[in-house]
Swiss-Prot record:
Coiled coil: none annotated. GO terms for cellular component: cytosol. Belongs to the DNA mismatch repair MutS family. Residues 1-10 have a biased composition (Low complexity). Transmembrane segments: none annotated. Gene3D superfamilies: 1.10.1420.10, 6.10.140.430, DNA repair protein MutS, domain I (3.40.1170.10), MutS, connector domain (3.30.420.110), P-loop containing nucleotide triphosphate hydrolases (3.40.50.300). Pfam families: MutS_I, MutS_II, MutS_III, MutS_IV, MutS_V. Keywords: ATP-binding, DNA damage, DNA repair, DNA-binding, Nucleotide-binding. One of its GO terms (biological process) is mismatch repair. This is DNA mismatch repair protein MutS. Residues 1-34 are annotated as: Disordered. GO terms for molecular function: ATP binding; ATP-dependent DNA damage sensor activity; damaged DNA binding; mismatched DNA binding.
Length: 931
């Protein structure tokens, strides 16, 4: 016997087609004018539901499809690349329509959410057959069951397992002073339950948003439309959702928070500024709205300490490729290079720690203690990693259960995670570092009975959906066991009945099947159908449905059997649903210790991963100091080093010492010169990345490192046009430089690469000169300043804490060889022409460039511009011919000879072949001279 589980093919969709089109038998042309202004019942329902969900694309269930109409259809069609068609008319106009199959709806939802759209999922709340009982024109009951937005998704199929999915609200309140405002950010990951708030201001807002990296931003209409902020919001790549002013209602904020968490007052969470309360309340209000009243297991909001993490602006994060590369990919970033985590939660926590390195030296040292302990304890580290790899994603499973979207597999994940956590908690002795000991305590705090109860209740193989049943272990509930036995016995009776019908009718292909519309039925091929319609079988079998190639019948005996099976099956499923609800309630009751256990598992994963990284890549523990030290011995770029290792090449390690000289209290600045491709940018970036790694709690790629805590990290490395804001490359460069010079403090670290290159030589040199002096005299910070303006090296005579450094190169047979070694001193040349030659510029261009360079270098310092105009015909307004420098009008006659000579390999030629080649070359030269 086989079950036919397919749904009736778009039965409801066909009914809707009838609603939208003229009934059969009536002239459609004549009826069109009459019905031009009539709204069909189905479309009236659609319009009503759509009006209640503005700003969202409405997925409207029609049988086996979700369909979209009107403007939603046009948007979805373009976004998803699916066909836009039309279905009937509304108020005399064609209705645009597109649809996606129910079976692929999650895939299309993922695409729409990734593009920043919000989707309201409207489902059928009853079977179409129930609607027909109320009358032929009755519409199936429907309503929105999910509001899916970029910041509130919890389904694994829509989430990146290794990336947080943050919903963030920005609140603004008036501050003292004319036109002054206080800002606050509240942000939560609904899929894990984390919830934090932080104070901000207009200057810090962009940096805070870059650090948190939200999936969706909530702001009030007034703030979104503020003239000063309008371009800012619209320039963000993150979806921004404007909300009515009431969502940011200050007087109701505290009450809303207290009601959400079920406490008398929000004061129990700590002291919050007014803007912080408003932002937090806006977040929970939006969650309640999008989750249709369901409440995820959020942690109470925690206030971030001011200055608790290294400030890294958005541009610096992009330049350093901390979490993603400039093209938006994870691969090739610092995170990808150091990630040795074995759990999704650990990967998310590692990304967060890289995004917000600590500034509290005690907390940094505590993380280093934990990593160092695990570096030494090899067996313990590897045993922990093995257990952690078996731990599911507790936090996301808990969130789905608390929202009523949990599955049997989510309950299984809770059971498995808690069991692994309890086992891990007993693995540590009394001499465990502080951070690890805290994790062990949190894991041990979960009562063992919950994991035991879940394990006893759940089967080994769990279905994806609770509605499928079959997830309760045999023997757990006696009532369920007896009901299942009745159901399963009935199924064996159906199989026996099928065999009897085959024997009685002689139709070997006869099958008893089942679907949701007909229930159980007998199916035979069209060729055998007449046999059942004739005596004596027509007294037993009643025709029900004719299909293409098959005919379906039923019988009284089969109907009675179906009633018994349905009753037992429905009761068994109902019992399982009751057990599921009871287990889910127990999990929700223990949500706080479960959430804390999930955080502990993630932290242990990060610590063991960083220890494994240190062992594998030879990283060392940095010495953290209270001062402004920055002394790195044998530093390496973590990403470039691994890339070179994959190709079998070594990475050249370099020292960097920006610590204050003995006679000064402020840090050094290194002025780095050297040719392009020599490794200046790599050197600058690697030192910034070492600071980030150290303060994130990791060991660093170096032989030794002594570092004072960096409060702010600034980088201006590379630039591009900002066409959306009408900014040229040079303007972007100047804006970034201005931010650095205005904000860098004595404890900051600044890396600057080629300031002033986007304008004329003298303008650029002047700006670079003045910027370098400002860093030295005003900011007095640690800095690496790379430049091609060699004239700046003379500033070391006036600036006590400025030191010259250069990237070592050598020449071999006219070519430049990059040694990638940073040494004291200044470069005397940029080797730009040699680099151009390596890049493959035509030989004639290289030769011309050398000639021009010779003239430039020989130019007199007095009035050089006129000298160049006179002696370089290519640039002169009225050229005075100079035979050796005349601008070429075509290929040089000798160029074929040079190319032929370049192709020859003397070591591969026999004496006779070499002599022939020599004669051939002389002949080519003679022909060239004749031309």
């Amino acid at each position: 016997m086989m079950d036919d589980t397919a749904m009736p093919a778009r039965a409801e969709a066909d009914a809707a087609e009838d609603e939208l089109a003229a009934p059969a038998g009536i002239d459609r042309t004549a009826k069109a004018d009459k019905d031009a202004n009539r709204v069909s019942p189905m479309m009236a329902q659609y319009v009503e539901i759509k009006a209640a969900n503005p700003g969202s694309l409405l997925f409207y269930r029609m049988g086996d499809f979700y369909e979209l109409f009107f403007e939603d259809a046009e948007i979805a069609s373009q976004a998803l690349g699916i066909v836009l068609t039309k279905r009937g008319k509304h108020l005399g106009e064609d209705i645009p329509m597109c649809g996606v199959p129910l079976t692929r709806s999650e895939e299309y939802l993922h695409k729409l959410i990734a593009l920043g759209h919000r989707v309201a999922v409207c489902d059928q709340l009853e079977d179409p057959a129930e609607a027909k009982k109320r009358g032929s024109k009755s519409v199936v009951k429907r309503d929105v069951i999910r509001l899916v937005t970029p910041g509130t998704i919890t389904e694994d199929s829509l989430l990146d397992a290794k990336r947080e999915n943050v919903l963030l609200a920005v609140a603004r309140t008036r501050a003292s002073g004319e036109g002054a405002y206080d800002y606050a950010l509240a942000f939560t990951d609904v899929s894990t339950g984390s919830f934090r708030v932080v104070a901000s201001d207009g200057d810090m807002l962009a940096a805070d948003l870059a650090r948190i990296d939200p999936a969706e931003i909530l702001v009030s209409d007034a703030v979104y439309d503020d003239e000063e902020l309008r371009d800012f919001w619209r320039g963000l790549s993150t979806p921004v959702t404007p909300l009515p002013k009431q969502s940011f209602d200050g007087p109701q904020a505290e009450k809303r928070l207290a009601a959400f968490f079920g406490v008398a007052t929000a004061d129990s969470f700590g002291s919050f500024a007014r803007a912080e309360l408003i932002a937090a309340a806006a977040v929970v209000a939006y969650i309640e709205r999008t989750q249709l009243g369901a409440r995820p297991a959020l942690a109470p909001p925690q206030r971030e300490a001011d200055g608790g993490s290294m400030l890294i602006d958005a541009g610096t994060r992009v330049n350093l490729e901390l979490i993603r590369t400039t093209s938006g990919e994870r691969r090739g970033s610092l995170l990808a290079a150091i990630d040795r985590t074995v759990t999704a939660a650990g990967a998310r926590l590692l990304a967060r720690r890289l995004a917000e390195p600590l500034t509290d030296i005690a907390a940094i040292r505590a993380r280093h203690d934990a990593v160092g302990f695990l570096v030494e304890e090899t067996e313990l580290r590897e045993a922990l990693r093995k257990r952690l790899a078996a731990a599911p994603d507790l936090a996301r499973a808990l969130s789905r259960i608390s929202l009523g979207r949990g599955s049997p597999r989510d309950l299984g994940a809770i059971a498995a995670g808690l069991k692994e956590g309890l086992a891990i908690s007993s693995a540590f002795g009394p001499e465990t570092p502080r951070d690890i000991a805290r994790c062990a305590r949190l894991l041990a705090a979960v009562e063992p009975w919950l994991a035991e109860e879940l394990t006893a209740a759940l089967a080994d193989e769990l279905p994806l959906n609770r509605r499928d049943g079959g997830f309760v272990r045999q023997g757990y509930d006696l009532d369920l066991d007896s009901t299942r036995a009745l159901r399963d016995e009935s199924r064996r009776v159906v199989a026996a009945l099928e065999r009897r019908y085959v024997d009685e009718t002689g139709i070997k292909s006869l099958k008893i099947r089942h679907n949701a519309v007909l229930g159980y039925f007998v199916e035979v091929t069209a060729q055998n159908a007449d046999r059942l319609r004739e005596a004596p079988f027509n007294a037993t079998f009643v025709h029900r449905q004719t299909m293409a190639g098959a005919v379906r019948f039923t019988s009284v005996e089969l109907g009675d059997l179906e009633s018994r099976i349905a009753s037992a099956g429905e009761r068994a499923l109902a019992l399982e649903q009751t057990i599921f609800d009871r287990l889910a309630a127990a999990v929700i009751e223990a949500s706080r210790p479960i959430r804390e256990a999930a955080e502990a598992l993630a932290e242990l994963d990060v610590l063991t991963a960083l220890a494994r990284l240190a062992v594998d890549e030879r990283y060392v523990r940095p010495e953290m100091t209270e001062g402004v030290d920055f002394a790195i011995s044998g530093g390496r770029h973590p990403v470039v080093e691994q890339a070179l290792a994959r190709g079998g090449g070594p990475f050249v390690a370099n020292d960097c010492d920006l610590s204050p000289p003995e006679t000064a209290q402020d840090a050094r600045i290194w002025l780095v010169t050297g040719p392009n491709m020599a490794g200046k940018s790599t050197f600058l970036r690697q030192n910034a990345l070492i600071a980030v790694l150290a303060q994130a709690g990791a060991f660093v790629p170096a032989r030794a490192a002594r570092l004072g805590v960096v409060d702010r990290l600034f980088s201006r490395v590379g630039a591009a046009d900002d066409l959306a804001r009408g900014r040229s490359t040079f303007m972007v460069e100047m804006v970034e430089t201005a931010a650095i010079l205005n904000q860098a403090t004595r404890r900051s670290l600044v890396i600057l690469d080629e300031i002033g290159r986007g304008t004329s030589t003298f303008d650029g040199m002047s700006i670079a000169w003045a910027s370098l002096e400002h860093l030295h005299e005003v900011n007095r910070c640690r800095a690496l300043f790379a430049t091609h303006f060699h004239e700046l090296t003379a500033l070391t005579q006036r600036c006590q804490r400025l030191a010259n450094a250069t990237v070592k190169v050598t020449e071999w047979q006219g070519d430049v060889v990059f040694l990638h070694e940073v040494i004291p001193g200044a470069a005397d040349r940029s080797y730009g022409i040699q680099v151009a030659k390596l890049a493959g510029l035509p030989k004639m261009v290289i030769a011309r460039a050398k000639a021009v360079l010779t003239e430039l270098e020989a130019a007199e310092r007095v009035s050089p511009a006129q000298r160049l105009l006179d002696e370089l015909p290519l640039f002169a307004a009225a050229a005075r011919p100079a035979p050796t420098l005349a601008a070429p009008t075509g290929p040089h006659p000798a160029e074929p000879v040079l190319e032929e000579l370049d192709r020859l390999d003397p070591d591969a030629l026999t004496p006779r072949a070499a002599l022939d080649a020599l004669y051939r070359l002389k002949a080519m030269l003679r022909d060239a001279a004749d031309d």
